[in-house]
Amino acid sequence: MVASPFEEPPLDCPRCPRLVGFRHELQGLHADWKNAPVRSFGRLDARLLIVGLAPGMRGANRTGRPFTGDYAGDLLYSTLLKFGFAQGTYRADPNDGLHLVDCRIANAVRCLPPENKPLPVEFTACRPFLQAELAVMSNLRVLVALGKGAHDQILRALTVRPAGAYPFVHNRLHKLPTGLLLADSYHCSRYNTNTGRLTTEMFHQVFEGVRRSLEA
């Protein structure tokens, strides 16, 4: 079990053998990378929690800060700055001085999975960390799921039943039985933007709705 009230996974977390093996492999190849479970970014008293699927290889797995160092972070942090959820300058570096405002960023799986695809057993092993995080965020009002994988894991972490009553739909805002709001967005990956599944305008619309919900 995860220690109470909330602790991030240790840097040598042993829960998922496949992810541990991949981590050790990358530690040998890239000794200057973080190559460890990526801890959440932002304050626990935030009203907004953004949940991604897992760290990116050359992003958070390299830098140690969620969505920092790859294209997904470029789009996410520029959007957070635009809508007042961040202050400072994003330079794709965890030492850039950027800080979040009333916002926190986490991942459903804290370690980098091969091919960016966590296995069901890995979601299950890591879920207690997200559950404990949610439990101590007493001011939380809105969650943003970046992708269907994150959406599904949020519902599981909150034990929302039936999950099928809350389907993943881009820019849909769900009111959950817990009273929390869940906003869905396609993941801000380069693949999704290159293929046209997600545009900058579409992503901004999600956070415009989030801001409106928090100010209501």
Language model: regions and residue ranges:
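A polyanion-binding, active-site-adjacent surface
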Residues: V2-E215
